[in-house]
Design a protein with these regions (language model features):
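C-terminal ends and interior cores of transmembrane alpha-helices
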Residues: 66, 70-85, 299-313
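Juxtamembrane intracellular "pre-TM" segments in multi-pass secondary transporters
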Residues: 180-209, 242-251, 422-424
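Cytoplasmic membrane-interface "Motif A"-like loop-to-helix N-cap segments
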Residues: 57-70, 286-299
Length: 428
């Protein structure tokens, strides 16, 4: 079920990572501006912890999830109706709203996992959840991208995005979730929640967990830029041929090649590899140290980035590098979710709020890492972009590894089933 929950959450993120860069790049917007747009659409996820407590109250989290998916899907649909580049402001405004509501979908999912799962299940759940988040959400954006290149109307590919956000969310209605029990008034309940969260954050596990999430490690930030940089790999590869063609024919050739490459990297093959990486990562995280696996995800990200940086700027480099990055991205996100769920532990009352604090920190890291990466495009080209991403991951892995080793904050290496509580006996 968490695969479907992840898909509902992942559609707006995939829009930001795949469809939005493709649409604005197609409208002849510079990659430098795309970096600003991606950063803008991540802003709601930085502050969602401020309003995330709402899903810890009133109706069940699964009902919140469906309601938020309906609103977010409608916002994405309207965003797709805007003409670029003339209506880029309302285009981004409705996408911004979709991200705002989808962030709360993530809060619902985190709360459901934290409250209902035992420790030995957290990696598995995180794997399937991120398979839906990345692969399921990514497929929606890929379908919309291909529909765009094939000349479909905005209402058609916008409708696909909305349907793939709302449809999977409805499956969560079949998940068993106990009714909410609120002690005292709403104000008193909110006060208790704030105290619980504040006390948790000042523990060693809370502080080091936030630092880990704020770092560039395992952010897989380049996943948000691949559809934007694809054109650079094409124009470099076809420079001689493009010089001989009229402007319209050259633009059509580039567009065809870009669509083909995005279809491979972000399509069924790429999303399938992402799902494999997420499920495998979740399996591994249930059997070893989760924080160590999170640091390993940063090393793997850097390895792919360095490989692309030192390879020729060609379509082959983009395709093979992008597919490897897709595989590693799944591993990164599964390790992130498993690490966060382990850090906050089993909690029914404030689970969504705690989970959102960590995901907000992680989204800040994704945004600033991608933003810094994109600054290297004008001076060093795409090799500088992927090289910067690798350097940030390596530096953060070294620093955090030393900090965790010094503080003894790597967490548990074994995740055994939690013992059942003894049944009370009535003495006659």
């Amino acid at each position: 079920m968490f695969f479907f929950a992840g898909t509902a959450y992942g559609v707006p993120g995939a829009f930001t990572a795949v469809l939005m860069p493709y649409l604005v790049r197609r409208a002849h917007v510079d990659l430098d501006h795309i970096g600003w747009y991606v950063t803008l659409l991540f802003v709601p996820t930085w502050f969602q912890f401020v309003y995330a407590p709402v899903v810890d109250f009133w109706i069940r989290r699964k009902h919140w999830l469906v309601l938020l998916a309906l609103i977010g899907g409608a916002c994405l649909f309207v965003s797709c109706q805007m003409t670029l580049p003339d209506q880029v402001v309302p285009f981004l405004a409705f996408a911004f709203l979709a991200q705002t509501f989808s962030g709360l979908i993530g809060s619902c999912n985190g709360g459901l996992m934290a409250a209902g799962l035992s420790d030995e299940q957290r990696g598995k759940a995180g794997g399937w959840y991120n398979a839906g988040n990345l692969a399921g959400g990514g497929i929606s954006a890929t379908i919309a991208t291909l529909m765009t290149s094939d000349g479909y109307a905005p209402w058609q590919f916008g409708g696909v995005l909305a349907a793939m956000m709302v449809g999977p969310a409805l499956a969560m209605l079949f998940v068993h979730e106990p009714a909410r029990k609120m002690e005292g008034t709403l104000v008193e309940a909110i006060g208790r929640l704030i105290i619980q969260v504040r006390e948790f954050l000042w523990t060693k596990a809370g502080i080091t967990g936030i630092l880990l999430c704020l770092s560039p490690v395992g952010t897989a930030a380049l996943a948000n830029y691949f559809s934007g940089v694809a054109q650079d790999y094409v124009t470099h590869d076809l420079a001689g041929e493009l010089a001989k063609l009229p402007a319209d024919a050259a633009a059509k050739l580039v567009d065809d090649h870009v669509s083909h490459m995005i279809g491979i990297v972000s399509g069924l093959l790429g999303q399938g590899l992402t799902a494999v990486g997420a499920i495998a990562g979740g399996f591994i995280c249930d059997r070893t140290n989760r924080r160590a696996m999170y640091l390993l995800s940063g090393v793997l990200t850097a390895a792919v980035g360095l490989g692309m940086a030192f390879s020729p700027t060609s379509e082959s480099t983009f395709i093979y590098g992008g597919l490897m990055y897709a595989l590693v991205t799944g591993f990164c996100y599964a390790a992130f979710t498993a690490t966060v769920l382990e850090t906050i532990g089993k909690d029914e009352k404030s689970a969504s709020t705690k989970y959102t604090l960590f995901t907000a920190a992680g989204n800040v890291a994704i945004a600033y890492t991608g933003f810094v990466d994109s600054r290297f495009d004008k001076s060093y080209g795409v090799a500088g972009v992927v090289g910067c991403d690798a350097a940030l991951n390596i530096a953060a892995v070294v620093v955090l590894g030393l900090v965790f080793w010094k503080l003894g904050s790597f967490g548990k290496s074994r995740h055994v089933p939690e013992p059942e509580l003894p049944v009370a006996k009535v003495v006659e």
